[in-house]
Amino acid sequence: MPRSFLVKKVKLDAFSSADLESAYGRARSDLGAPLHDKGYLSDYVGPSSVYDGDAEAALLKGPSPEPMYAAAVRGELGPAAAGSAPPPTPRPELATAAGGYINGDAAVSEGYAADAFFITDGRSRRKASNAGAAAAPSTASAAAPDGDAGGGGGAGGRSLGSGPGGRGGTRAGAGTEARAGPGAAGAGGRHACGECGKTYATSSNLSRHKQTHRSLDSQLARRCPTCGKVYVSMPAMAMHLLTHDLRHKCGVCGKAFSRPWLLQGHMRSHTGEKPFGCAHCGKAFADRSNLRAHMQTHSAFKHFQCKRCKKSFALKSYLNKHYESACFKGGAGGPAAPAPPQLSPVQA
């Protein structure tokens, strides 16, 4: 904590005001009450007696008002603690200065851990409450005796009955069979595709993936009204329809784009900005996708291999450039190799 936030000197009991002191002195002399050695009234003054005007009855030699802590609380500590002196202050070094001031130079800032200022949000509390609610039924079912499930008179026997009249057992078995379908979550909580075996974390992602297994001749396939391209995946078709709506236009060259981030990346070609740099070699790129493609060149996995010289490449575009090099033009005195086969878009 900065030192500017620390209070250097604070006056304790020396508040002085001429008007307040004079008014207090006049009232003290009018009452005629005895004073304590520290300057305050030692006896309790009954307000009813003062208001009635009885000066002699104004001084009540009765006990003082009730203390802040009840006597029963003090008695619980034992008879030895009841008459003991109050404990000393825990920080006596702060009040050693003369005149009743706190010595701010001797004060030390208290340090707190980060957990002391951490306040959990509603999601953490809801997660904890849901976890507790889920643990309660499992604990109750584990603690139930085995005799309750065998047809006893309780509600547990009726819900878990396995006989012909046990509706609970029949419905539970049907639910288990329904959950054990081809798209159900496995042991690891993943949802597997029944056709290709690919797994997904959520059932919605699995249902979206299943659209890719549809045939182009299926009734669920949709055709683009602009270009006639057929799609079996509705999210893919929705993204394709945006390519026909070129509403984002470059103000420099007039080129239009379907998405604003594509226009933003295009503007870097005019400004020369390359904010995406490679951490391995320092090469910079204007687009993040180009950086991701470049990062594959530093990977140990190079899946594209030249059929002649057996040289491997991480990107297919690098392999195509290698096909156009001297290796396939009969360089180094060797015979010219045949042109690389043209792959269809599906094989690519």
Curated annotation (Swiss-Prot):
Entry-linked PROSITE patterns: ZINC_FINGER_C2H2_1 (PS00028), ZINC_FINGER_C2H2_2 (PS50157)
Subcellular location: Nucleus
Main localisation: nucleus
Domain notes: The N-terminal non zinc-finger region mediates the repressor activity.
Comp. bias intervals (Gly residues): 148-172
Biased composition range(s): Low complexity: 130-147, 173-182
Region (Disordered) location: 130-189
Sequence similarity: Belongs to the snail C2H2-type zinc-finger protein family.
Pfam families (alphabetical): zf-C2H2, zf-C2H2_6
Keywords: DNA-binding, Metal-binding, Nucleus, Repeat, Repressor, Transcription, Transcription regulation, Zinc, Zinc-finger
Protein name in the entry: Transcriptional repressor scratch 1
GO biological process: negative regulation of transcription by RNA polymerase II; regulation of DNA-templated transcription; regulation of neuron migration
Record function comment: Transcriptional repressor that binds E-box motif CAGGTG. Can modulate the action of basic helix-loop-helix (bHLH) transcription factors, critical for neuronal differentiation.
A single GO molecular function term of this UniProt record: sequence-specific double-stranded DNA binding
